[in-house]
Amino acid sequence: MRRATLIPLAIWVAGAAAAAAASLPQFPSCDISLANIGLSQNSQIFFPNGSGWESETIRWTKYMAPTYAVSVRPAHVSDVTQVRFATRCKIPFLASSGQHGFDTELAELQNGMEIDLSAFRNVSVDAKKNTLTVGGGVRFMDVFDPVFNAGKEIRTSETDHQVGTGSGACVGMISPTLGGGVGRLSGTHGIISDQLLSVQMVTANGSLVTVSKKENSNLFWGLRGAGGNFGIVVEAVYQVTDLTSEKVVNLDYAFSTNDTGAIIDYLALFGPNMPPKLSFIIAALYNEKLFGGVGDPGCVDPNRGRQSANTIPPSLFQFAVIVSGLYAGPQSEAEQLLAPLLQNATLIKQNISVVPENKLVYAATFGSQGNSTIACSGKGVNRSIFGGAINTYDKATYVDFLKAFGDLVTTNTDLRGSVFFIEHFSNYQVQKIPDHTSAYPWRDITAHLLFNYAWNDPANQQLMLYSARKLPRLRALKKEWDPENVFRFHHPISMS
């Protein structure tokens, strides 16, 4: 396991229910119909140019996106097992839920079949057994209220650690779980995959198997970190426990890029030792729409305090650095921890609120992480993600970069949707789970950086995703469970 402090970076620069068979030119020997595929009558099939096709297949980003000749929406688990039809006909396919995946390998699927799991959005909490059961199409927004209203929270199994859900309300829950599942409460809650108890999974040959510590335990190891390579998860069971704290403190601040150095100095104070209850998302973006422009009542004049008049220079609203903090404890402690930053940076706008944990995702980052924001609206837009890892914050690099980035998006209107993120979460609870327990390899990462930019390094991708120490075991699992490599379009594992 890597012991250096690593900071991963990223940039973002059917006719429904068709009854008649359709022979597609791409697959002339396989007529596509409910009966021929073996689907139940409540399932649906969509074709290009048919009713509902665009809404069925449109993705959050159209950059390097897969394309489909047909989309199937199964109604029951038994319908998903008919994936054997696609494998028999050599039809490349991809299961989808929130449709937020942005990995460039997705573009290798062209004129294939989408298996839409949106009918599987069932959520149930068993308060006596302390379990949460979700369908394969569930989004994070589907579980916030049921878990909270049951007086429960998600925790890692076999420990007393809490585990938080993600930062985007409309993103599917299963895919992040299979990749590990970091979140804003990772310091106190750990990663989502550590509390996964079992899944029901459809394999490439159409078999429905249970995967847990007791059944197919070796595969269970691989699912938690590289799960998209082995099958389609149609149901997952998580550990939950009694709610320990109903509310958290949300702290949002806006600064100009003149304060980039002060922000980086502040983050560097914590490094890999971020307090467990504290986390930050830093967003550098052109913010006119987000803040409503000059005169926003949340604006702060550094010399005269909060202002409702147009006292802030317009240039400060064109590009800004947003610091969105979260503290899972008393507000007084949170404000004490933020004091060094506020003493050294010029505040433009702030919002401090104490919110129920199940509403945090809607309040954070000035309300930009809820249903109507970056992750949950504007599908079909060109968005590309660059990712990497660094050992430390280099102040001069960030100061120079954000100045240049701000100038670029301010003067080029077509680029104003680009955002640079730093996600600095505590890994306190993440590191308490031994590295060998799952395929997830990056428990020692300090922060995540996201940038809207197109880049890929296929030669090193598997090492970046899974690490040299995990790949041999993962490749053996791949040969055992998917020897034909049909699950190869999202963070794929090669078998050699």
From Swiss-Prot:
Per its record, what triggers expression of this gene product?
Answer: Expression is up-regulated during co-cultivation of A.fumigatus with Streptomyces rapamycinicus that triggersthe production of the polyketide fumigermin during the bacterial-fungal interaction.
Top class in the EC scheme? oxidoreductase
Query: What does the sequence similarity comment in the record state about its family?
Result: Belongs to the oxygen-dependent FAD-linked oxidoreductase family.
Q: Which cofactor does it need?
A: FAD
**What keywords are assigned to this protein?**
FAD, Flavoprotein, Glycoprotein, Oxidoreductase, Signal
Q: Where are glycans found on this sequence?
A: 49, 122, 205, 258, 344, 351, 371, 382
Q: Which residues cross the membrane?
A: none
Put simply, this protein is called FAD-linked oxidoreductase AFUA_1G00980
Query: Is Flavoprotein among this UniProt entry's keywords?
Result: yes
